[in-house]
Amino acid sequence: MQKNAAHTYAISSLLVLSLTGCAWIPSTPLVQGATSAQPVPGPTPVANGSIFQSAQPINYGYQPLFEDRRPRNIGDTLTIVLQENVSASKSSSANASRDGKTNFGFDTVPRYLQGLFGNARADVEASGGNTFNGKGGANASNTFSGTLTVTVDQVLVNGNLHVVGEKQIAINQGTEFIRFSGVVNPRTISGSNTVPSTQVVDARIEYVGNGYINEAQNMGWLQHFFLNLSPM
């Protein structure tokens, strides 16, 4: 009987240790969906025997002489210059104090109450105090710089371009992912086909990685469970 109990205890201990080693916690990606787009082929024109054709096929390799090279179609590329520098700080404090004191006694005690209230037995004194001090503060600073080439995946009705892109960098046994999405106004695109990220509307910038280094920085799901249950 004792042998079976020891065997069960050993199996339970190994199971608990294996569960504490699990570090997989599901997370929702900031940039969702496909991170690239293919050009949409145009309709095939019907030859009418005339020199002038009312409907010309879309030729993505054709570039007019007096036309800039800004992206305007689905599948065109654009370089985003990441220039994010955000800092924020917050502090608050509160103080509260309250003191109170009460005295009660008989100056003259009747003779028949001398045994009960005599010798200052009727004197009552009560005092109390309450003090509260609270202080809180938070500081946050984020800096992100670099370049990322994205693809136009949608042309909005007002001419703005919705762009998405992803860059993957493999370093040893880990992979770093940089994902970006947002809405670009074509007027903010420079002659070198670049636009700073500070001028992108609804910008979503995501920098994540996978591998053993990234897993070592995450808390195990069982530890996360007990952390939520802990009253401390």
From Swiss-Prot:
Its main location: membrane. A lipid is attached at residue 22 (N-palmitoyl cysteine). A lipid is attached at residue 22 (S-diacylglycerol cysteine). It is a lipid-anchor. Keywords: Bacterial flagellum, Cell outer membrane, Lipoprotein, Membrane, Palmitate, Signal. GO terms for biological process: bacterial-type flagellum-dependent cell motility. PROSITE patterns: PROKAR_LIPOPROTEIN. The keyword Secreted does not apply. Transmembrane segments: none annotated. The keyword Signal applies. It is found in: Cell outer membrane; Bacterial flagellum basal body. One of its GO terms (molecular function) is cytoskeletal motor activity. One of its GO terms (cellular component) is cell outer membrane. Residues 1-21 form the signal peptide. InterPro entries: Flag_Lring (IPR000527). It holds the Pfam family FlgH. It comes from the Bacteria. Assembles around the rod to form the L-ring and probably protects the motor/basal body from shearing forces during rotation. The basal body constitutes a major portion of the flagellar organelle and consists of four rings (L,P,S, and M) mounted on a central rod. Belongs to the FlgH family. PANTHER family: FLAGELLAR L-RING PROTEIN (PTHR34933:SF3). This is Flagellar L-ring protein. The gene is flgH.
